[in-house]
Regions:
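N-terminal strand-loop element at the rim of the active site
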Residues: 5-13, 26-73
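A conserved mid-protein helix/loop that constitutes part of the nucleotide-sugar donor-binding site
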Residues: 17-22, 198, 205-221, 238-244
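Short His-centered aromatic/hydrophobic patch
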Residues: 97-103, 121
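Carbohydrate-associated surface elements
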Residues: 166, 184
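Aromatic "clamp/platform" in nucleotide-sugar-dependent glycosyltransferases that forms part
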Residues: 261, 280
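Short hydrophobic beta-strand element within catalytic cores of glycosyltransferases
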Residues: 297-301
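Conserved acidic donor-binding segment of nucleotide-sugar-dependent glycosyltransferases
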Residues: 312-314, 318-325, 333-340, 354
Length: 383
């Protein structure tokens, strides 16, 4: 099977980029497959090694010489010409869009081979509307942009693949071409947590969406009862200075530590005893699965979408209503005070994480591709 992934870049350290590489590598290992990753911008080496994959850089370079709206549409026209030419040379069976800049173009291309066109949604459908808006103009712009995406461009795909049943049920009612496929675990760590260290951990970009300000306030409540425990927050981002100031003003220096960026996320997780998530929204919450894969129990806000899919409340962790900092702190304290419960939940999560192994997810994708290609062929032959 000839499979093409189209995305913005594989040189940027981001979740979509890592997941795309990991899936493409796994599919390329399956006998009979030939896999391409086609990018618009490749200014440096891929963030993960590519194993048996054709990498094609179209050289559009949206982000290196971007000159406003006029320049963007000029780049889009260039992108369309190059992408159409390449795909007609490859003649793929399946084309998957995972990025942003190609999503508008694929349904418009003239492709005589009629490949299966799939759009992967790595964010919950209305994620842009969930961000805090500063003006009515921004609200209107985001609404119009969303309508354009989902009522015109997205309908040009054969199938849309979302990450959770929750997203499908809440946001895609009436769409009969929407399917669900979770992301795989993208790294493996042989060392598992003992759940004995007096450390809780959170990982993510220091941005509004992750709401680490809420987590710091929660930890202020936790440390009143358990001053010997500490919280490590791993990641970098635009809110770092503001969060450091919040920590200082709350008297939590040494209790809450902004650790910076690490490429060894699972290793850091394995040295902790709890994983905490206070995001306002997630596309999937892959970080929760990664935490489970090293045996950590979870406490998470029940934000859209992902935590409800991953966490079975009371079994491998706890779900808390978004913004309920008091209950969140109580759940954390409950796990701190009950080591056997921590370990029991950690083991339950470890077992649950096995269904997200990349080998299993790759086989599920292959079966999905085969089924959808057969269905498309049947429809074509019946005309």
């Amino acid at each position: 099977m000839r499979i093409v992934y189209c995305t913005d870049s594989v040189c940027i350290l981001g979740g979509v980029e890592i997941v795309t590489i990991v899936k493409a590598n796994a599919l390329a290992k399956i006998a009979g497959n030939e896999v391409w990753i086609v990018v618009a911008d490749a200014q440096s080496a891929p963030i993960r090694p590519l194993e048996g994959i054709h990498l094609v850089d179209l050289g559009v370079n949206y982000y290196t010489d971007y000159y406003g709206l006029k320049g963007f549409y000029k780049k889009q026209r260039l992108h369309k010409v190059h992408l159409e030419k390449l795909l007609n040379e490859i003649k793929p069976d399946v084309v998957v869009a995972t990025g942003q800049n190609e999503r508008n173009l694929l349904p418009l291309l003239q492709l005589p081979s009629k490949p299966l066109l799939i759009r992967e949604m790595h964010f919950e459908k209305h994620y842009r509307q969930k961000k805090k808006k500063k003006s009515m103009l921004q609200k209107i712009f985001l609404w119009l942009s969303e309508q354009l995406d989902y009522l015109w461009r997205i309908k040009g795909y054969d199938y849309i693949v979302v990450l959770t049943e929750e997203d499908k049920e809440q946001n895609w009612k009436g769409w009969n071409n929407v399917l669900v496929m979770p992301n795989p675990i993208t790294s493996v760590c042989d060392v598992k947590s003992t759940c004995e260290a007096k450390t809780a951990i959170a990982v993510g970009r220091l941005v509004e969406q992750k709401d680490f300000a809420s987590l710091i306030r929660i930890w202020g409540k936790v440390t009143e009862k358990h001053p010997d425990w500490r919280l490590e927050i791993w990641g970098k981002g635009e809110l770092e200075a503001a969060l450091r100031q919040q920590i200082e003003e709350s008297g939590l220096e040494g209790k809450v530590c902004l650790m910076g960026y690490t490429a060894e996320v699972l290793q850091k997780m394995s040295q902790a005893s709890l994983y905490l998530l206070t995001s306002m929204f997630e596309g999937f919450g892959l970080v929760l699965i990664e935490a489970m894969s090293v045996g950590l129990p979870l406490v998470s806000y029940m934000c859209p979408t992902g935590p409800k899919t991953i966490i079975e409340d009371g079994q491998n962790g706890y779900l808390v209503a978004v913004g309920d900092e008091k209950t969140f702190a109580e759940r954390v304290c409950q796990l701190i005070e009950d080591e056997p419960l921590r370990k029991q939940m950690g083991q339950a999560g470890l077992k649950e994480s096995e269904k997200y192994r990349i080998e299993d997810i790759a086989q599920r994708w292959m079966q999905l591709f085969r089924d959808l290609l057969a269905k498309k062929s049947s429809r074509r032959n019946s005309r």
